[in-house]
Amino acid sequence: MVHPVQVGKRTRMSFSRLKEVGQMPNLIEVQLDSYDWFLKEGLQEVFDDINPIQDYTGNLNLEFVGYKLDLDSIKYSVEECKERDSTYAAPLKVKVRLLNKETGEIKEQEVFMGDFPLMTEQGTFIINGAERVIVSQLVRSPGVYYDMTVDKTGSKLFSATVIPNRGAWLEYETDSNNIIYVRIDKTRKLPITILARALGYGTDAEIIEFFGEDERLKATIEKDNTKTREEALLEIYKRLRPGEPPTVDSAESLIESLFFDAKRYDLSRVGRYKFNKKLAIHLRITNQIADQDIVNPQTGEILVQKGEKIDKDKAIEIQNCGINEVYIKIDDKSFKVIGNHFVDIHSLVPFDISDLNIKEYVFYPVLKEILDNYADEESIKEEIRKNIYRLIPKHIIREDIYATINYELGLSYDIGYKDDIDHLGNRRLRSVGELLQNQFRIGLSRMERVVKERMTIQDQEVITPQALINIRPVAASIKEFFGSSQLSQFMDQTNPLSELTHKRRLSALGPGGLSRERAGFEVRDVHHSHYGRMCPIETPEGPNIGLINSLATFAKVNEYGFIETPYRRIDPKNKRATNDIVYMTADEEDLYVIARSDEPIDENGYFIDDKVTVRAKEEVLVVPVSEVEYMDISPRQLVSVATAMIPFLENDDASRALMGSNMQRQAVPLLKPQAPIVGTGIEYKAATDSGVLPKAKNAGTVVYVSADEIRVRRDSDGGIDKYKLLKFKRSNQGTCINQRPIVSKGEVVAKETLLADGPSTDLGEIALGKNILMGFITWEGYNYEDAMLISEQLVKEDVFTSIHIEEYEAEARDTKLGPEEITRDIPNVGEEALKDIDERGIIRIGAEVRSGDILVGKVTPKGETELTAEERLLRAIFGEKAREVRDTSLRVPHGEAGIIVDVKIFTRENGDELPPGVNKLVRCYIAQKRKISVGDKMAGRHGNKGVISRVLPEEDMPFLPDGRPLQICLNPLGVPSRMNIGQVLEVHLGLAASKLGWHIATPVFDGAIESDIVDCLRKAGYSEDGKTVLYDGRTGEPFDNRVTVGYMYILKLAHLVDDKIHARSTGPYSLVTQQPLGGKAQFGGQRFGEMEVWALEAYGAAHTLQEILTVKSDDVVGRVKTYEAIVKGENIPEPGVPESFKVLIKELQALCLDVKVLNDDNQEIKLKESVDEDADELEVNIEGTENQPEEKEEKEEEKEDSDEYDDLREEDVEPDLEELSLDDLDLDDFGDEH
């Protein structure tokens, strides 16, 4: 029944029936833990891989001994980095030792290896002042994968791929003649026996003896024209290195370096783990019949007798006593199963070796050698440590290759199984740490080359580590990764939920991943292994659907990069659900039968029903209680955070829920956030983990609270913790970040207590929208096609008002003609335009500005013209005339307006770091209050989105019997066909809850049901169907039928009409085609495309069509004449030849075709080569519009790019219309696309 739950400072009435076992993990630990691992272990691994660097003679030996990140010498804090456009990083210092073997001299030095970007507490990086997130990548795990296809004759053909982390691939395939081929590193295919011979089984007899009798093997041997190991080696060498003279030695070393050299071939820990898992012998012999006695080689004891069935435990015992070949009986044939000879070290070493921390299987022959040669515990441990890379090889070994071939042979006897590439057991996550590690490794290996070269060139006596090491390649590869990798993304900061989701995103794209074009349907589809690991709902619509996913709420990532989800263990003896929680990967989960979390159990954990609904792999079954092994821990463990915030998700169609999840991330933070009346109970957790809210670092008492600072006296030592609050800061997306304290003076706070609310949070709960009184009713056609009718009250009372902050910057540079100057003294500008400019030439804070107003006054020196003799004489007499300057001030762009909230000034004199050539940098921040208006996009949480069609006066809105007018009217037809019934339930429950004064939590898949809602309505005194009589506000008459009315949570999305509305008369033109540019950012025109031309043709509107194709587009002279005619009020002249026609003729001429243009009388029409010839007759210039909108370059993506823009701006700022005649202008250079 409904019960109160405390969420932060608010009490919610919860409808959940299930007791949740286990806590949700910290929602951004994916980022934090991974980066942490990188700093602690990942960096060390890379240095270990590269150690030692030797010169070509092997005399000099350079090794990296240790490293530290110098956290004390971080230059700027996170806030300062954002302000100064710098990177939040710490210097990486590495201790390097150089050994000269001839002289035995050792030199040690600490070498600075560049600044290393640090992760902030929120899981982000500050790169060049912009906050970025590194998205985790889902890739195919290294390992062995088997696949099966059926050919025309119906026979099964098996293929395999051996994928390392880096190195050469091996691919096996069978053709319809039963011949097995291998491709080495994507080259042409060879019979597989050639590979077996090259690896050591040279003759036909040896191959058959080792792999056992098999038709496919025999067929392959017949096809194979080599007969000895040497021939096979030469054959492989010819294929891999065509055109080089083959010798046996070079072939041997080629194969060695391709597969058995740890520097070239890396399986990684995951790869080794997956290999041992797949190729272990015990999996293939379990439940098979032994064809010979199986004897323990150490003791001589018979483990399994001939003809006996091998059970699971016996199979594991067989493997762990070092047996690698087992004969089993299949359809009266004997088949030999070969493993890769890895064993569990703990079963063979007679004492405790937990301190060695070996989790993987180890290679048996090496272990046996150690155990045979050493007896006492210490020396065995010492030898194991020494030989760890032989015990757990990082590269593939011969035994692995033999086992893969044997597995391939066994598949046709139904021994082993084929793999599903889309299963999450075969896909792993590369998070920040690993991506960085790979990048760092690339940088170090480039550096290694340089070091080797310097070792040979420089004098070996005086050489120092510092002189050998060039850190450029390392620094460059890190910089490149953070700056331009596909996985390093500009953080989506629209609201706290979008930040959180961005950090939890999983992408299958990026380097080493898939590409949009190649990704088929299977990769994108929902898979049974996604359950509890990846959300089946939240993914973008469009070309990336299914390639970009979101981590589920309870999911964690294990040390190998596989995603795990938690389950409750069911006690095997008495079948009772315990509170033990086990995290399982997808392939572990496949071995068990798992019950649903809402399966009824009593208070002691016993199942109430005899039959239980369970999941087993991809099937949903009903089984007796005795078979259940695990149980889900929560109904919301299968969805992501955004999806878990949709109440009544279970009543929505999946495609609408997808839109709901995605649109919550686009909700703009409002002026006064309001938590939802009907929530799901996860809002608090999401807000606290998103990192936007300040928390108390220590327990204590609040001693001071103001709008921008909170001070807490610590209980431990009486010291004071200060917390600065952010006020009206600009987010990456231009929304407003503003924090408001929620504690009061004297309040006692525990550690981790929230001290303030941020954007879109209310008492620590995420609050993306507003609770609005709405009804499902049509109104005069204003709800047609998802339009929304809203009341003027929402505008008057600022219900949906949001603050948006834009940043504009001006820089004063050195130009060829002298430095630019920021000044109040601007040519041809009246005092009126300078009323808010201070004496430095910069706008004052608090000024109200409109489009075209000056923000920063700036003048640029103009080119000096050649002076005539008279002028020179006058100058000589009257002294130097003031140098010519032109006005290049920063102005408010077209269509923007607001209030200046902040101005930042950076100059060389104050010691600020500025880009080369820049003397002064000014940034102005303009804030706008945007009220809700017609054309804004709004949405509920159930994918019910719409655009505002009309703002109606309050008195005309339909009203309730108690006189309250509705705030929004929605179209009832938006519900049935879209099947998002959740919105109706939300409205009913919202109506009851607002009357009862409750806030409600109805968790997904475990929330209120119909009867609960009816009870609440009854309790609140409403009728059970939730409908009420509604009166027409214009006439006061009741509407014919009763109407569903209630409270719905509605969001205002970041698609605001002010950002989209756009109009142009004249403006910039493209350089080559001379057609208007496109898009609002370029102040472009509307495209009149092919189909639109057909429409005019269909109506025979010849003049309109001619006008559109010429003077409104690219007839350069014609458009100037037309403008002139309009200004003078004359008739519009005949259009000329469009520029694009001239471009076409030039293209044809480039193809060596001589093209002439003829008129009706077959007279050639001369096309003028340049516009200048036409230009003489013109008097008006429309090229420079009055104030040419400077491209408002989004500061968004990369700040480095801004240099390119600025170079262009100086030369291309358009002059004023009145000042110049067209002759002064070189028309070709006009308004080029920046």
UniProtKB/Swiss-Prot annotation:
GO terms for biological process: DNA-templated transcription. Keywords: DNA-directed RNA polymerase, Nucleotidyltransferase, Transcription, Transferase. Residues 1171-1180, 1191-1234 have a biased composition (Acidic residues). InterPro entries: DNA-dir_RNA_pol_bsu_ext_1_sf, DNA-dir_RNA_pol_bsu_external_1, DNA-dir_RNA_pol_su2, DNA-dir_RNAP_su2_dom, DNA-dir_RNAP_su2_hyb_sf, RNA_pol_bsu_bac, RNA_pol_bsu_CS, RNA_pol_bsu_protrusion. CDD domains: RNA_pol_B_RPB2 (cd00653). SUPFAM superfamilies: beta and beta-prime subunits of DNA dependent RNA-polymerase. GO terms for cellular component: DNA-directed RNA polymerase complex. Its EC number is 2.7.7.6. Residues 1169-1234 are annotated as: Disordered. Disulfide bonds: none annotated. GO terms for molecular function: DNA binding; DNA-directed RNA polymerase activity; ribonucleoside binding. It catalyses: RNA(n) + a ribonucleoside 5'-triphosphate = RNA(n+1) + diphosphate. PANTHER family: DNA-DIRECTED RNA POLYMERASE I SUBUNIT 2. The RNAP catalytic core consists of 2 alpha, 1 beta, 1 beta' and 1 omega subunit. When a sigma factor is associated with the core the holoenzyme is formed, which can initiate transcription. DNA-dependent RNA polymerase catalyzes the transcription of DNA into RNA using the four ribonucleoside triphosphates as substrates. Belongs to the RNA polymerase beta chain family. This is DNA-directed RNA polymerase subunit beta.
